[in-house]
Amino acid sequence: MPFLELTLRCTEATQPRYENALEDVGALAVTLLDAEADTSNEQAILEPGVGETPLWDTLVLSALFPADSNALLLLAALEAFDPELDWSSGSFRAVEDEDWERAWLDQFQPMAFGSRTWIVPWNHELPEAAQAADAAVVRLDPGLAFGSGTHPTTALCLRWLDQLAVDGLLQGQRVLDFGCGSGILALAALKLGAAEAIGVDNDPQALVATADNAERNGEQARMHVYLPPDEPVATYPIVVANILASALDALAELLAARVAAGGRIALSGILHGQEGELLQRYAEWFDDLQATQDGDWMRITGVRRA
C-alpha cells in the first residue's frame, strides 16, 4: 500500500501542536526524529522517567497519509486548523509501503560488540558470524524505547562485558545491571556466561520491558528485576550502571556497596569532560580506575578495593 508522506521540522515546544493538527486532518502515523542526528549537535535521550516523553530541541516530523490524498488540500486544512504554525517548510513525497518499512528496519541492523556479543533485531536473520557456537546473541525489537545497543553508552558497556568474558571473569558470576532499561546489558551478560542477573530500575515500564525481553530470549529463570526500594541488599562480582553522570555521582556510595571485594564495576552515561569528577569520586572505593572514550561518551571501570 503506497502513502503520501509529509516531512517538516519543528521544535520541542511546537511539536504537540503540529502532531495534533496532523492527526486531526487524518494522518495515519506520525514519526519523530532528532533533526541533528548524526551531527555534532546530536542529543542523546536516555531512559525517560515515569510519565515523561523527552524530545529533542529540534525535530524532523514525518506523517503518513493515504496515497490518494491531495497535498494542497491537506496543506490548506493544516493551515486552517492552526494558522499560527509555519507549514511552509513541509515537503510531500509518495512512498511505497515496502520503502517505509525497509527504511525503518534498515536503521536497526545486527550489531557486533567485542569478540562474540551480538544484538540482533527479531526481524533480521542471524548473520553468519552470530551463528557460531560461542556467539552470545541477544534479540531485541527494533526501536525499543529503553536501549537497543545503538547508543555509545550501551556499546561501551557491551564491549566491557564481552572483554570480561574473554578474560574468564564473567563465567558463573552474578551480575547487577543498575538502571537496566531494556535489560540489554544483563541479558548480554547471561549470554556471555553469567549465572544470574539482577536488573534494577526506577521506572516500572523498564522492568516490564526487561522481563519481557528476558522471556523472549529464554532467560526468564535467571533474570530478576526490582524497583530500587525492593532490591535485595547484596554484593556482586560484576556491576554495570549505564545511567547519567549526575545519578552516578549521587549513587556512588550505594553502587560501591553493591560491588564485592575484588569485583568489577562499569559506569556509563558519562559525557566527555564529566569523567574527571567521577574518577575522583569513585577512587574512594576502587582501584585501577580507567576511562574509555567512544565519541562524546565515556565509560569508567574499576576494581573494588577489599
UniProtKB/Swiss-Prot annotation:
Please tell me where S-adenosyl-L-methionine binds in this chain. T154, G179, D201, N242
Listed GO MF terms: protein-lysine N-methyltransferase activity
Biological processes, Gene Ontology terms = methylation
Catalytically driven reaction(s): L-lysyl-[protein] + 3 S-adenosyl-L-methionine = N(6),N(6),N(6)-trimethyl-L-lysyl-[protein] + 3 S-adenosyl-L-homocysteine + 3 H(+)
Q: Does the keyword S-adenosyl-L-methionine apply?
A: yes
Q: What is its EC number?
A: 2.1.1.-
Q: Name one GO cellular component term.
A: cytosol
Gene3D superfamilies membership:
Vaccinia Virus protein VP39 (3.40.50.150)
Q: Where in the cell is it found?
A: Cytoplasm
Q: What is its main location?
A: cytoplasm
Kindly give the Pfam families that the UniProt entry links to this protein. PrmA
Keywords, A to Z?
Cytoplasm, Methyltransferase, S-adenosyl-L-methionine, Transferase
Q: Does the keyword Methyltransferase apply?
A: yes
The record's listing under InterPro entries reads: Ribosomal_L11_MeTrfase_PrmA, Ribosomal_PrmA_MeTrfase, SAM-dependent_MTases_sf
Q: What does this protein do?
A: Methylates ribosomal protein L11.
* Family recorded in the similarity comment: Belongs to the methyltransferase superfamily. PrmA family.
Task: Please state what the protein is called.
Answer: Ribosomal protein L11 methyltransferase
Q: Which organism is it from?
A: Stenotrophomonas maltophilia (strain K279a)
